[in-house]
Amino acid sequence: MFNLLTEGGVFAKDMLFATLDTTHRVLRLPSGQPAILSDTVGFISDLPTDLIDAFRATLEEVKEADLLIHVRDISDPLTERRREEVMQVLDQIKAGPEHGQDIIEVWNKIDLLGDVQMDKIEERAQASIELEDMMSAFPISCHAKTGLARLAQGIEDQLTAGDEILHVDVPPQQYDVRAWLHKNGHVIKETTKRNGTCEMDVRLSESDAGKLRARHKDLVS
């Protein structure tokens, strides 16, 4: 999934310890906005004691994420048990929904399901998206390369929830503001007038929109 979404070349195989280190790639969201996608170590039941600390160290990065994406093998008969194990580990490192962190689930390997199972999975996934108090789930098949566009849109919807689109007029003498907007926001439209004023429509997170208004409220309309 990581490689398909980012067109990366990360080693991927269904085997123990296939991914040990955290890998980062740029994910281009449907709107064109970039996001950093990190591939962390997988979760393993009954991990040997001497490896627990090493795995925990790599998972510490999880706490810094704006959004967690839990990839599940939905064809695994023990998939619900695996899910509970993951949630327990997240809670132990003070990450996940119990600690105010957004998370979505990706239900991979739907190509291995029968028609009846698939119908039930689709119904559950749709309900999860429509109900705000449920964790959103996105059925995909990396093997068949299906469901990825819907997943990418779901990721963007989660990341941009609460964002604001502001119109900002930046005069020539304050082009440091323009640089800040490019660094911290997603510039949707930008034009420069004859007097040098830069007119910008930019998407900002709620916190960054607040910072902009606090520092330069005269530029925001």
Where are these regions (language model features)?
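Walker B catalytic acidic pair
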Residues: 40, 74, 109
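C-terminal-of-GTPase-core extension/linker across diverse P-loop GTPases
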Residues: 2-7, 77, 88-221
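Generic enzyme active-site microenvironment
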Residues: 37, 71, 106
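Conserved catalytic-core segment of NTP-binding enzymes
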Residues: 23, 49-62, 71-98
